[in-house]
């Protein structure tokens, strides 16, 4: 197999892998790098010049995996795009939201390249976005060659899948983003533990030791305890969340706690894209049974819209639990503004429930010490950190030990490392060299072709 990583910045970003098996050409994912802006955030598609792709696979609907898909499809006007049914139900909504954000950033930040694609273009490509069920092998004839592919549930978020490719007698597996343990609203990954000639694996947590005893169930209890203690001292709780997956999981956890009288009495506020996606997950749950979330949760929690009259740096008008995006507290989002309102008072808590890039405001706040001054530059607020800042392990990614165990179970002849920062990939390269010495381990340099 020939493989080229089109994510020019490497690491975790504009995920996009170009592969050729025999005379069959395909791409896995086409994302945007959240650390970049404009065209620099997109994959480098120059290696595809003159190439007619037979298929494009989408592993899941996070923007670092789908955010540049309309651009790729623009250059491949006849290529079908295949994904799971839940991903097909989500993808248009996620792309339309991305276009809206780019229009706003063009106006606010003067990024004249934005939007990279329009709502009309999303509507035009929609007929080429095709669903395919899990665990259902399908033969696909390309222009000059054919393959068989199978999707396997990868946990992570609704619709996430690993992709198994069979070409002649060769078996290849792409894990995508994977979580083996179950979440409150989603079952864990069910990946095939069989021999593969080539394994292409994510490495997100390769540099992260598994904290002892941090089972998701324990973290749920710790989160509810933190909320209750905050409410008892008269404070409010901010829970910054990713709109797709994490918001719905946190709302389900709050619903469970309230149902069993384990959550203090306080209004719960939520708004934005995540609330809209609650409808989508409710629909996915009803149609596929692959998600465990219903709109009944919102009704029984009596969710209120987040107040629009928040003044940065000033106390919110109502004590409550605020479940809002963005998860990394990106500037000019609801979580960013609310953090500026709460961080200076010791009665409040800010509870992070997902990964924060160290270069984002959320990452900066987690790294800061209590008593330090913290600048919310986008709203011109400077406050001394007094609030309780907590991080909870609700990761959507497998531990490095789980991924290593999976690689050992598959006994591949070659392993390709993807979706990880350099230290994460280095850990896997070292461990695999020791435990699978017969396997060729490849950490691809972006835009360089490799034969595996």
Q: Predicted segments — roles?
A:
Residues 1-51, 131-187, 313-315, 321, ...:
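Core dinuclear metal-dependent hydrolase active-site scaffold
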Residues 20-22, 166-168, 189-193, 253-260, ...:
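Short, solvent-exposed amphipathic alpha-helical segments in soluble enzyme
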Residues 95-157, 286-318:
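Metallo-beta-lactamase
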Residues 181-270, 349, 354, 373-440:
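Cap/insert and terminal regions of metallo-dependent hydrolase folds
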Residues 223-361, 418:
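Hard-cation-handling environments
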Residues 282-320, 370-411:
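C-terminal helical cap/extension that packs against the catalytic core
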